[in-house]
């Protein structure tokens, strides 16, 4: 067994961004599967903070509540403005 002599670097921001993207994708899929317009529902949630805009289906409401709304907006703006 060889020992890696290189220092590993942990990027907390990248991991947070990946988690946010993953949760948004899962919530999006759950909303679509239930017949909702995901954009309208997510906008309603982001504006009001009311989690009932997000379906309970597949645990989507619990997932979205793991994120702060400002984190979601940050990720959406990064994607929209193509800033990585």
UniProtKB/Swiss-Prot annotation:
**Stretches of the chain forming a coiled coil according to its record:** none
Q: Where is the signal peptide?
A: none
What the entry lists under InterPro entries is as follows: IreB
Q: Which PANTHER family match?
A: UPF0297 PROTEIN YRZL (PTHR40067:SF1)
Q: Which family does it belong to?
A: Belongs to the UPF0297 family.
Please state what the protein is called. Answer: UPF0297 protein NT01CX_2279
State the organism named in the record. Answer: Clostridium novyi (strain NT)
């Amino acid at each position: 067994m060889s020992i890696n002599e290189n220092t590993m670097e942990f990027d907390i921001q990248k991991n947070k961004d990946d988690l946010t993207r993953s949760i948004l994708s899962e919530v999006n899929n759950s909303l679509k599967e239930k017949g909702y317009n995901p954009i309208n529902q997510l906008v309603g949630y982001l504006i009001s903070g009311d989690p009932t805009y997000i379906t309970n289906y597949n645990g989507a409401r619990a997932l979205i509540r793991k994120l702060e709304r400002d984190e979601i907006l940050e990720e959406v703006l990064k994607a929209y403005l193509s800033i990585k």
